[in-house]
Amino acid sequence: NMKYFEFESEIEKIETILDQLNNNQELNIDKIKKLNNEKDELYKKIYSNLDPWQKVQVSRHGERPHTLDYIENIFTDIVFLHGDKKYADDNAIVGGLGKINNKSVFFIGTEKGNTMETRIKHNFGMAKPEGYRKVQRLLKLAEKFKLPLISFVDTAGAFPGKDAEERGQAEAIALSMKVALNCETPCISII
């Protein structure tokens, strides 16, 4: 079941009626079509007038797509690259090579996970120094092979643990920013 926000209560009512109509033996196609049109108009009206807090709520919705969902639906011939070549692989950052319309591109993104198991695996999307170094590595590879890079930004922020600080969290973040700003290949960020 989809979760609705308080400001979506009218949409939820229409969805409930549509579910009942779809489960009914005697389908009323005209009524379903009318309700779907009404629902679409409500979505347009509501989402064109969200206040700042409602925008935050939407951005944090538990059922919205995550980076891996986008990667799996946008790219073909996906090859994930792992590790920072210094310490470890940070699963909060996913990246690699893929194709869009038969053209190779690099991709990078923060992954939060969809279930408790995957959220733990991806550290709730909080990158450690090795994740930021993985980003640097992928940026440099994209530049070396003169391929565009697409990044997906959906971050909760850097991991605030003592071990991450001891391994150079601040420096890794700063260097990632420097490498990204100096990268001489087309880069697109999707937030």
Outline where the language-model segments fall.
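Terminal-region recognition feature
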Residues: 1-191
